């Protein structure tokens, strides 16, 4: 008996010409493309000096392969155990999202010139906007947002799990007196880390070293403790500080090319369209109405801003002790009580009590309104819904000039180099700037630039750098015919 599907096949009319007339593809014959031969390997690169809390370190990227792609900071936190001398009421916990919080800043430098600089705060915001739902729980484990680190330690609690002994592992509900040694894997988010087509060609940078400079945050911004066993209320933290980081290094994914492609990469010039971060520092505010001048340049994909109460990152024990530590990634206008109610190990913070401190926002370009005044939730909810993978936590605000700002392919920009005055007008809630309250506004911009890598063959390095950095293709910073001595290109 003939199947009913044939009825669909013969029901063909003039309207179908727009869909199936002169077909260009078939769904029933797979087509693939052959690729060049290559191999990948992740290799550990050590830091120069001893990495530790509050220290600045540098990693000179080893020339183990032809290109570099992904990078991960691997850092091991020391084991923390309460001692009887800490007192009966002693407590300790690592702060949430310790992996992001650990990084004060990280920057990439090529030939002595800084190309891009990221911050732990930005890495957390970027994760909130872009992380796929299926990876969020695993990513939280990678960066240490787990109960065994963020739950409070109490005197008389259970000891840490020991892998050398059998038995059922401790659950998050079990009270412990010990936080285990824990290795963090924090992925860096530079342009070449996110797209293999932008992998940085070490083989073409024959005369320039690539360095990663990183500053770890100080320990008092990473944990909370209380000790009533001595005159030192921070005896536990000081003991952890003496131990320091157990280990820290950089894991780099190297790409090895086959002979022909390797020769081509080494001999020809390269020009990469890259996206980098701009941040000019936080601005303190104490009033509800604020007018912020944005000193950004280059074609900008989007603006991202947060307003954070200064009390959330205070070092005053009388302020943070009721909340068991600082809340560096709380961008709402009230303390996050959900961390208390959930045992400190929430992987996201939608349940917080506070609201978006941005009541309204307006962007002006040379005195002209870019849009009408909008409610803060438009930037916290609608804009991320339109342009990003995730709708972020409360208080992360976005305005995108691009259709798809997460993608490398340009899909819209605003050239802020051609705008004399870019101004962000914010109305902020009284919970953020009320009586005796102050907050800090941080505005980030992602923009395009061009990285030029010139072949070292027949090249006078003293007269012209082997790589050039600047956006305008028409305004060449370097040419073989004319090259000002020692000109190193534009600074970000």
Protein language model regions, located:
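Short, low-complexity Pro/Thr/Gly
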Residues: 1-492
């Amino acid at each position: 008996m003939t199947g009913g599907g044939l009825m669909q096949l013969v029901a063909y009319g003039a309207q179908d010409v727009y869909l199936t007339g002169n077909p260009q593809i078939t769904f029933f014959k797979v087509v693939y493309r052959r690729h060049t031969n290559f191999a990948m390997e992740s290799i550990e690169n050590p830091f120069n000096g001893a990495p530790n809390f509050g220290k600045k370190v540098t990693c000179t990227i080893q020339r183990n392969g032809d290109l570099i792609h992904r990078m991960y900071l691997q850092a091991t936190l020391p084991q923390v155990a309460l001692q009887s001398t800490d007192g009966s009421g002693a407590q300790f916990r690592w702060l949430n999202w310790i992996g992001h919080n650990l990084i004060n800043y990280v920057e990439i430098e090529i030939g002595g010139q800084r190309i891009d600089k990221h911050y732990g705060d930005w890495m957390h915001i970027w994760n909130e906007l872009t992380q796929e739902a299926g990876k969020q729980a695993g990513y939280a484990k990678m960066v240490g947002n787990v109960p065994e680190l963020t739950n409070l330690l109490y005197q008389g609690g259970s000891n840490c799990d020991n892998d050398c002994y059998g038995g059922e592992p401790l659950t998050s509900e079990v009270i412990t007196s010990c936080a285990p040694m824990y290795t963090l894997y924090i992925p860096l988010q530079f342009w070449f880390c996110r797209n293999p087509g932008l992998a940085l060609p070490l083989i073409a940078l024959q005369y320039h070293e690539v360095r990663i400079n990183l500053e770890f945050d100080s320990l008092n911004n990473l944990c909370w403790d209380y000790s009533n066993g001595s005159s030192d209320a921070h005896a536990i933290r000081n003991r952890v500080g003496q131990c320091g980081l157990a280990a820290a290094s950089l894991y780099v994914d190297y790409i090895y090319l086959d002979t022909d492609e390797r020769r081509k990469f080494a001999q020809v010039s390269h020009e990469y369209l890259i996206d980098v971060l701009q941040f000019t520092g936080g601005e303190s505010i104490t009033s509800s109405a604020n007018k912020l001048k944005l000193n950004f340049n280059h074609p900008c994909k989007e603006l991202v801003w947060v307003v954070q109460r200064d009390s959330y990152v205070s070092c005053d024990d009388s302020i943070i002790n009721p909340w068991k530590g600082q809340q560096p990634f709380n961008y709402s206008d009230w303390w996050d009580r959900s961390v208390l109610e959930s045992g400190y190990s929430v992987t996201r913070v939608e349940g917080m009590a506070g609201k978006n401190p941005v009541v309204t926002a307006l962007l002006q370009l040379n005195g002209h309104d870019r849009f009408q005044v909008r409610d803060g939730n438009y930037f916290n909810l609608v804009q991320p819904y339109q342009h990003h993978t995730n709708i972020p936590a409360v208080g992360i605000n976005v305005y995108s000039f691009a259709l798809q700002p997460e993608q490398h392919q340009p899909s819209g920009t605003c050239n802020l180099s051609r705008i004399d005055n870019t101004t962000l007008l914010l109305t902020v809630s009284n919970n953020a700037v009320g009586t005796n309250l102050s907050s800090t506004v941080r505005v980030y911009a992602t923009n395009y630039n061009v990285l030029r890598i010139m072949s070292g063959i027949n090249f006078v390095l003293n007269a012209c750098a082997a790589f050039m950095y600047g956006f305008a293709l028409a305004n060449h910073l370097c040419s073989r015919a004319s090259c000002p001595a020692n000109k190193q290109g534009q600074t970000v």
